[in-house]
UniProtKB/Swiss-Prot annotation:
This is Integration host factor subunit alpha. CDD domains: IHF_A. Pfam families: Bac_DNA_binding. Belongs to the bacterial histone-like protein family. This protein is one of the two subunits of integration host factor, a specific DNA-binding protein that functions in genetic recombination as well as in transcriptional and translational control. The gene is ihfA.
Amino acid sequence: MSTLTKSDMIEHLMSHLNLTRQEGRCLVENFFDELSESLIDGKEVKLSGFGNFELKDKNSRPGRNPKTGEPVAVSARRVVTFKTGQKFRQQVDERLFDQ
C-alpha cells in the first residue's frame, strides 16, 4: 500500500488540469487551510460523497504513564474525527473485493 502526499496531489492537478506547480500548490494549500480553519473555528466539515470531519469533546479520565505505570490524569480535550460517507465506503469496499 502506498501513501498519497500533498506533492502527489499537486502533480495530479498539474497533469490533469494543466496547472503550473505554483497554481497546484496554491490550490492544495488553500483547500487544507480552509478545512483547518473551519475546524479550528468549531465548524464541522462535510464533503459530500466523501465524508465528514467532526469535532468531539473527550472527557478527562484516569490514565497511566506507559513507561512508569504511574497513574496520571488525562485532561479533557477536543479531537477531530473523520467519518467516511456511505458512498465512499462502498467504493472502497468494492475496490478491496475486486483485487
